[in-house]
């Protein structure tokens, strides 16, 4: 049997972390078994579904490289198929037309609640004793079995049982002729030959209803696995303040897709004590029986730690392809300066996100208008004039421009003036970067370039001279 899974989001908003984890688990399960992964857009909610949300979902899936083998399928393009199946069910007697008014149903609901009963349809139209004209408005209900129970073996939670007496005669077609969500899902899973349905635990109550419809259609019932919810690190329902933002927001904030995937796979799944997983390792090791049925806690600090790891462990050339987008957002012209892969090597240890890296690299490519006030006040003082003049001349004398030779020039300046390296290094750092912090000074000066470094030292010397004149 070929394994076939699906990810079926509703395009009423962005692809959030919970949906992305569900998609990842479904994708990994299919890949682990050499199966297929289907993308289906469940857009039957016409009022809330938007083209922008569809685009956001596709962008998120593509950024995470969760490629699909079939689709995307759209439920709104399959209404003829759904209605054809409903008509067959009406003919077979497994569905019936219901003419009950909203007023009657509301009165029935209030009466049942007053008695402490669970609100449910009472089956008045099920046996068709009343005569109605063909043009009279009606819904179509599924004739749910009235006795027995539905039992399914959830691959994460074990055996789950629902009494059929607890289940309503579900509406499967509205008065306007549109099919309902629970019915569309059933026909889709049947037609698309889905073997395993991996989804959030909020769908557990839908499962017995869907199984009963599948059985009424003599269709195969897929295997179900319901993933637990994700909480914030305070144990409360995940919200934006915990990090429940769109997948693409993580891209915008400077995270690598590898970091987010690694983090999401560990939100409920484990393989021993291993924390870092390549995509290939995830595919090889993933199994549903290792998914926890307990809620997971979202921890942004852990995600940030993973991102820093991947910035420094992946090939700099690859990281640079993702950094490029952030560089463009900052409007930095990188034609005159180090290659982005070199920049990743320079700033990787200091920066935990690519956004931070892009925001802290401008001095490598563009001259700055002024020095950081605090750094200049502390380090660009008259006492720094001689160290800057000497190191400038030694840098100018370098014939083979390299980080090693830059280091020798700085060291030689300190030795000649009989001062510590900091007395040379700190003024030089502020002079060439405009600020008091940077990567190692020798590689920084080397990356900025010989002529630009000397120009900036001269600018710093002019700043010191002007400062002296003002005193």
Swiss-Prot record:
Q: Which cofactor does it need?
A: Zn(2+)
Q: What biological-process terms (Gene Ontology) are attached?
A: glutamyl-tRNA aminoacylation
Annotated binding of ATP, by residue: 240
- What does the sequence similarity comment in the record state about its family? Belongs to the class-I aminoacyl-tRNA synthetase family. Glutamate--tRNA ligase type 1 subfamily.
The name under which this protein is listed is Glutamate--tRNA ligase
Q: Name one GO molecular function term.
A: zinc ion binding
Q: Where does Zn(2+) bind?
A: 98, 100, 125, 127
Keyword Ribonucleoprotein listed? The answer is: no
Compartments it resides in: Cytoplasm
Q: Where is this motif: 'HIGH' region?
A: 9-19
Ordered alphabetically, the record's keywords are:
Aminoacyl-tRNA synthetase, ATP-binding, Cytoplasm, Ligase, Metal-binding, Nucleotide-binding, Protein biosynthesis, Zinc
Q: What is its EC number?
A: 6.1.1.17
What sort of enzyme, by top EC class, is this?
ligase
Main location class:
cytoplasm
As for what it does, the entry says: Catalyzes the attachment of glutamate to tRNA(Glu) in a two-step reaction: glutamate is first activated by ATP to form Glu-AMP and then transferred to the acceptor end of tRNA(Glu).
The cofactor binding remark recorded in the entry reads: Binds 1 zinc ion per subunit.
On whether Coiled coil is a keyword of this UniProt record, the answer is: no
Which reactions fall under this protein's catalytic activity? tRNA(Glu) + L-glutamate + ATP = L-glutamyl-tRNA(Glu) + AMP + diphosphate
- A Pfam family for this UniProt protein? tRNA-synt_1c
List the InterPro entries hit by this protein, alphabetically. aa-tRNA-synth_I_cd-bd, aa-tRNA-synth_I_codon-bd_sub2, aa-tRNA-synth_I_CS, aa_tRNA-synth_I_cd-bd_sf, Glu-tRNA-ligase_bac/mito, Glu/Gln-tRNA-synth, Glu/Gln-tRNA-synth_Ib_cat-dom, GluQ/Sye
């Amino acid at each position: 049997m070929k394994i076939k899974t699906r990810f079926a989001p509703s395009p009423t908003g962005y692809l959030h972390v919970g949906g992305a984890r569900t998609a990842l688990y479904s994708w990994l399960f299919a890949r682990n078994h050499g199966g297929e992964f289907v993308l289906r857009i469940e857009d039957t909610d016409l009022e809330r579904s938007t083209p922008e949300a569809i685009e956001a979902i596709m962008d998120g899936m593509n950024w995470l490289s969760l490629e699909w083998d079939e689709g995307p399928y759209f439920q709104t393009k399959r209404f003829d198929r759904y209605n054809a199946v409903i008509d067959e069910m009406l003919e077979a007697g497994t569905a019936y037309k219901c003419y009950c008014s909203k007023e009657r149903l509301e009165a029935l609901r209030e009466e049942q609640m007053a008695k402490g009963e669970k609100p449910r349809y009472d089956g008045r139209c099920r046996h068709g004793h009343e005569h109605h004209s063909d043009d009279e408005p009606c819904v179509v209900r599924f004739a749910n079995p009235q006795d027995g129970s539905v039992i399914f073996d959830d691959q994460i939670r074990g055996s789950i049982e629902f009494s059929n007496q607890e289940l309503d005669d579900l509406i499967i077609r509205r008065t306007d002729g549109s099919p309902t969500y629970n019915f569309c899902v059933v026909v889709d899973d049947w037609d698309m030959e889905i073997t395993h349905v991996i989804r959030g635990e909020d769908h557990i109550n839908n499962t017995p209803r869907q199984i009963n419809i599948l059985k009424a259609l003599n269709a195969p019932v897929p295997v179900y696995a319901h993933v637990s919810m994700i909480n914030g690190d305070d144990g409360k329902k995940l919200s934006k303040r915990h990090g429940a933002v769109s997948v693409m927001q993580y891209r915008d904030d400077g995270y690598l897709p590898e970091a987010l995937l690694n983090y999401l796979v560990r939100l409920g799944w484990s393989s021993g004590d291993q924390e870092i997983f390549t995509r290939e390792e995830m595919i090889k090791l993933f199994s549903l029986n290792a998914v926890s049925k307990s809620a997971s806690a979202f921890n942004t600090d852990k995600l940030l730690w993973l991102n820093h790891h991947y910035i420094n462990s992946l090939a700099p050339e690859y990281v640079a392809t993702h950094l490029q987008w952030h560089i463009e957002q900052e409007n930095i012209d990188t034609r005159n300066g180090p290659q982005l892969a070199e920049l990743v090597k320079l700033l990787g240890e200091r920066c935990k996100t690519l956004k931070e890296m892009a925001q802290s690299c401008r001095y490598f490519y563009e001259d700055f208008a002024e020095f950081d006030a605090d750094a200049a006040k502390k380090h660009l003082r008259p006492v720094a004039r001689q160290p800057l003049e000497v190191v400038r001349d030694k840098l100018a004398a370098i014939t083979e421009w390299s980080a090693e030779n830059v280091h020798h020039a700085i060291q030689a300046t300190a030795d000649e003036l009989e001062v510590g390296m900091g007395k040379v290094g700190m003024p030089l750092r502020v002079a060439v970067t405009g600020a008091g912090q940077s990567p190692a000074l020798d590689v920084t000066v080397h990356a900025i370039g010989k002529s630009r470094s000397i120009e900036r030292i001269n600018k710093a010397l002019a700043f010191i001279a002007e400062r002296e004149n003002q005193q």
